[in-house]
């Protein structure tokens, strides 16, 4: 996604933004449900008041009005907005939701030829200079 000094924010240059966006493509919402204390439709992600930004030590106990428990907020989830270096998990429930997308509206992935090896074109790389 870029490097520091190339116009890319260095806290987000480890490729996790792509992971986050693929999560959306596979039917995941942000862990705060895209609303104040909203619903992400996944039972094993704790309720969150809003997005987290930056990077924290676990547990990050910024308790909010949504019912976060003593385990702290799930800031390290790919579907939050923390720095790339702090994102590292999808929950089992999120994985189930993504598999449901692959078995449903994204089922074409299973028969796609996009993962097959590319066949050589039979073009010669020999160049003659005169």
Predicted ranges, named:
Residues 1-21, 25-129:
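Extracellular (secreted or membrane-anchored) zinc-dependent metallopeptidases
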């Amino acid at each position: 996604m870029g490097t520091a000094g190339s116009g890319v924010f260095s806290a987000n240059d480890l490729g996790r933004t792509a992971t986050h966006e693929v999560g959306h493509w596979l039917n995941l919402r942000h862990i705060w449900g895209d609303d104040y204390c909203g619903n992400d439709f996944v039972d094993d992600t704790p309720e969150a008041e809003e997005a987290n930004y930056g990077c924290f030590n676990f547990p990050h106990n910024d308790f909010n009005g949504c019912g976060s428990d003593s385990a702290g907020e799930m800031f390290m989830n790919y579907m939050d907005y923390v720095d790339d270096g702090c994102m590292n998990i999808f929950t089992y429930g999120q994985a189930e939701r993504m598999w449901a997308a692959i078995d449903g509206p994204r089922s074409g992935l299973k028969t796609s030829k996009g993962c097959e090896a590319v066949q050589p074109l039979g073009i010669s790389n020999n160049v003659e200079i005169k």
